[in-house]
Design a protein with these regions (language model features):
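HIT superfamily nucleotide-processing domains
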Residues: 1-213
């Protein structure tokens, strides 16, 4: 078991990462984050950015952490473009307010999903989730639970009035993939996709730094 540095929670699966599990392999470690594959990899090309600090959402990052977070988003957008020939989508179920009835997160420790997927019917997703466009991450409220969605064109959306369903965005993807009964990562690991993701990210290695800016 490997404990994430800084503030942590003894009962949190992201504070104590079991490196003996393939799905917890550390693909990259930075000062403030880990990059890992994940259980429930609905597609080939699915990773998480996990905060080392035990915080409830990425809105609680300090300035230095936020800068590194944005760098990693750009870095892995471009890595996915090189590997899969298209940009990924990115989302976070931010649970800033634990007293709110609105939540879509299944693990209350800040983590962001990067997925090799583009929605077929994005207009319907935006309508049903009540997404609104934002210009930058700093605009997200620190007092409300939210879903952040960044599409393949790097357009950023936020919703504070989303359907309160655990793993909501995963459910939306699974529905389009016609595997709705397999959206829950607790029961469906997709080990082959995990292995493919690990191998392809390792194979491509580091890109030119200019690609990450």
């Amino acid at each position: 078991m490997m404990r994430i540095h800084g503030i942590y929670n003894m009962n949190c699966r992201f504070c104590f990462i079991d490196k003996s599990k393939k799905y917890n392999e550390i693909l990259e470690e930075t000062k403030y984050f880990y990059i890992t594959p994940t259980l429930g990899s609905l597609v080939d090309g699915y990773i998480l950015i996990i905060s080392k600090r035990h915080i409830n959402s990425m809105t609680l990052l300090n300035e230095e952490e936020l800068n590194e977070y944005k760098y990693l988003i750009n870095k892995y957008r471009n890595k996915f473009k090189n590997i899969y020939k298209k940009y990924p989508i990115i989302f976070e179920h931010g649970t800033t307010n634990l007293n709110s009835n609105f939540s879509a997160s299944s693990v209350v420790h800040a983590h962001t999903h990067i997925i090799n997927y583009n929605f077929y019917d994005e207009d319907n997703l935006i309508k049903n989730t009540k997404f609104k466009i934002i210009n930058k991450l700093e605009e997200i409220s620190k007092n409300k639970n939210y879903i952040l969605y960044i599409n393949q064109n790097n357009k950023k959306y936020i919703s504070y009035e989303f359907p309160s369903i655990s793993q909501y965005m995963r459910m939306c993807i699974s529905k389009e993939l016609n595997i709705l009964n397999k959206y829950d990562w607790h029961d469906n690991y997709f080990e082959n996709n995990i292995n493919l993701t690990i191998n392809k990210i390792k194979e491509i290695g580091e890109l030119d730094e200019e690609n990450y800016k």
